[in-house]
């Protein structure tokens, strides 16, 4: 099975080896071929998204499914919330059973904050976590991607 995954940028693409490793340990003999399709900052919208999905599903080497992964914070006001983003992507693509829109409630990079101690070790810095009890609170005003970028720029 081939699954094309539309992603917004370099962080998401860099995540794929770890995702493949995680899935291969759990999908014994049923591991799909994950094909990341990377864009610069946000995946296409409206008619362009529909054309891309159609091409991926019916091209020379067609995918069996297409997953679109987007953030709420795309640098625009295209989406008001996660449900709005999923609904709009589904509407733009149309009635395609093997298209699966998925939305990171905040930045994709926020998913990385779960491993804050490991991030600090990798950056070789000591810094307390930039949120209180709820990591989602840090999105407003300064997204996780910017915080992570600053952390690695100020390293040792």
PLM feature segments, named:
Residues 7-9:
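Extended, compositionally biased accessory segments flanking or bridging domains
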Residues 2, 13-39, 50-156:
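C-terminal accessory helical subdomains adjacent to catalytic cores in phosphodiester-
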């Amino acid at each position: 099975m081939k699954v094309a995954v539309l992603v917004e940028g370099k962080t998401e693409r860099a995540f794929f080896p770890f995702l493949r490793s995680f899935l291969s340990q759990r999908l014994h003999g049923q591991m799909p071929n994950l094909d990341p399709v990377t864009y610069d900052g946000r995946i296409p919208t409206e008619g362009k998204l529909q054309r891309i999905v159609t091409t991926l599903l019916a091209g020379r080497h067609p995918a069996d499914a297409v997953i679109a992964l987007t953030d709420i914070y795309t640098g625009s006001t295209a989406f008001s919330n996660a449900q709005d983003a999923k609904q709009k992507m589904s509407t733009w693509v149309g009635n395609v059973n093997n298209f699966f829109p998925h939305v990171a409630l905040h930045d994709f990079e926020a998913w990385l904050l779960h491993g804050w101690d490991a991030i600090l070790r990798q950056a070789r810095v000591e810094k307390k976590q930039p949120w209180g009890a709820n990591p989602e609170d840090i999105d407003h005003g300064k997204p996780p991607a910017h915080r992570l970028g600053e952390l690695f720029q100020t390293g040792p």
